[in-house]
From Swiss-Prot:
Subcellular location: Cell inner membrane
Keyword ATP-binding attributed: yes
Keywords (A to Z) from UniProt: ATP-binding, Cell inner membrane, Cell membrane, Ion transport, Membrane, Nucleotide-binding, Potassium, Potassium transport, Transmembrane, Transmembrane helix, Transport
Name of this protein: Potassium-transporting ATPase KdpC subunit
GO CC entries: plasma membrane
UniProt keyword annotation of Transport present: yes
Topology in membrane: Single-pass membrane protein
């Protein structure tokens, strides 16, 4: 029996060291060298170097002077990241969409883009389609006292055009550019 136990325990110890320590350390080291920004969470910093969020996680922006993100089913908390899991035919979803549209977008003209009223699959998608940003442009321009044309330049610069899929705008990056152009604190 010792002939079987000793090699088995040796293998367990060896694999524990390799897969529990050496492999994770090697992957972390390679990631830090090859992709330091992504390995550390794609953190977004302001002009003072302070972390303002991650380029991969949506944030809530309140007030007319900011472009709004998609709604979040988990209150923008990464721990509670999830979709609402409500089907399009669910009356609770219809009521929430109706309430959100009335509360946030009642003063604006035309139908509210779907992306501004529905949560994403993760509940934390940081991107919006350019149409959803364009819908918010008049409100933000009025609040910041900046022309819509100047804001449209910011939107065009912030629009990502992936190889596959439609163009999207990272709301955090756009709001940071907006703050550099026309700081809200100065108003």
């Amino acid at each position: 029996m010792t002939a079987y136990v000793r090699p088995a325990l040796s293998l367990i110890l060896l694999m524990t060291v390799v897969t529990g320590a050496l492999y994770p350390l090697a992957v972390t080291g390679i990631a830090q060298v090859a992709f330091p920004k992504q390995a550390n969470g794609s953190l977004v910093r302001d002009d003072r170097g302070e972390v303002r969020g991650s380029a991969l996680i949506a944030q809530e922006f309140k007030g007319d002077g900011w472009f709004q993100s998609r709604p979040s089913a988990g209150a923008y908390a990464t721990v509670a990241s999830s979709a609402s899991n409500l089907s399009p035919s669910n009356p609770a979803l219809a009521e929430r969409v109706k309430t959100d549209a009335a509360a946030q977008y009642q003063a604006q003209q035309g139908p509210v883009p779907q992306a501004l009223l529905t949560t994403s699959g993760s509940g934390l998608d940081p991107h919006l389609p350019p149409e959803a940003i364009a819908y918010q442009l008049p409100r933000v321009a009025a609040a910041r006292q900046v022309s819509e044309e100047r804001l449209q330049v910011l939107v065009n610069d912030a629009t990502l055009r992936p190889l596959i899929g439609p163009p999207v705008v990272n709301v955090l990056a756009l709001n940071q550019a907006l703050e550099r152009l026309a700081p809200l604190a100065a108003r």
